Regions:
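Non-heme Fe(II) oxygenase catalytic core, chiefly the N-lobe of the double-stranded beta-helix
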Residues: 2-239, 245-278
Length: 278
């Protein structure tokens, strides 16, 4: 088996074929996949046949799995390492990067499509990805100098409040206090600077709250222009891997009366962005 890559967008994202992720891949193949993620930031593996065990086994080849979130409801899936991205969470419709609200944020996410809804007037349930490396590169130099030293506070409660959801238990609130992350970070794999934004970012530390919120809004608007965005149209059997350290993503609307079953695993970064090289 050899990895075959076909670029899907002028600046990032690639279809990846020639490998069966349900098998015990040699380390050379895993290294090829890691290098492709560093280059393209988003990889789409079509026509995979994965169950939860094989998806989890492959994810572990790419890094330590992030700890499960505090969750008070009943879980549908057997393995707590999975996030159930099905008909459940409107918060995923906002631009975000996975687990930026954790002290040690997410690194790579792997989302597998077991079942997808039919196209509908409400939408097809695509996922959009924004390349935050290219978005940073396109900023004026004066703006780069302004934002270089800035730190934003991230909280899952802030992003959920934007869609009117505030019903967290005391245990969930205690388990997920606000955290601080760099607004501009350097990717540890390839050394390129990238914006680090999310709907979880509530304000800029040591700035007046209105000024910081407006800056965050302006940067998200800049980073999500069409020239920086790839749209993934799902098919059953697609596994998509994306690098949260240099992308944002969001889910699009779909007919929520239809079954939809997508399951995500996210690996954990090495440290808080504040503890990584600037």
């Amino acid at each position: 088996m050899s990895l075959i890559l076909r670029q899907l967008h002028p600046i990032f994202a690639a279809a990846a074929t020639g490998v069966d992720l349900s098998t015990n891949l040699p380390e050379t193949a895993v290294a090829e996949i890691r290098a492709a993620i560093d280059r393209y930031a988003v990889l789409v593996f079509p026509d995979q046949r994965l169950d939860d065990e094989t998806q989890l086994a492959f994810a572990r080849r790419l890094g330590p799995i992030e700890p499960p979130q505090a969750y008070s409801g009943a879980r549908r899936l057997k393995h707590a390492e999975f996030a159930d991205v099905s008909n459940l969470d409107a918060g995923n419709r906002l631009w975000h990067t996975d687990a930026s609200f954790r002290h040690v944020p997410g690194a790579l996410s792997m989302l597998y499509a077991h079942r997808i809804p039919a196209p509908s007037p409400k939408g097809d349930g695509e996922t959009e990805f924004a390349d935050m490396r290219a978005a940073y590169d396109a900023l004026p130099q004066a703006m780069k100098e302004i934002i270089e030293p800035l730190v934003a506070e991230h909280s899952i409660f802030h992003s959920r409040a934007q869609i009117g959801f505030t019903e967290f238990t005391d245990e969930e609130r205690a388990a997920m206090p606000p955290v601080r992350q760099r607004l501009v970070r350097r990717h540890p794999g390839f050394g390129r600077k990238t914006l680090y934004l999310a709907s979880h970012a509530s304000h800029i530390v040591d700035w007046p709250v209105p000024d910081g919120m407006l800056l965050l809004r302006d940067l998200i608007e800049h980073a999500t222009q069409l020239e920086f965005v790839y749209r993934q149209r799902w098919r059953v059997g697609d596994l998509v891997i994306w690098d949260n350290r240099c992308t944002m993503h969001r889910g699009r609307a779909f007919d929520e009366t239809q079954p939809r079953d997508l399951r995500r695993i996210t690996t954990q970064d090495t440290a808080s962005t504040l503890d990584q090289a600037a």
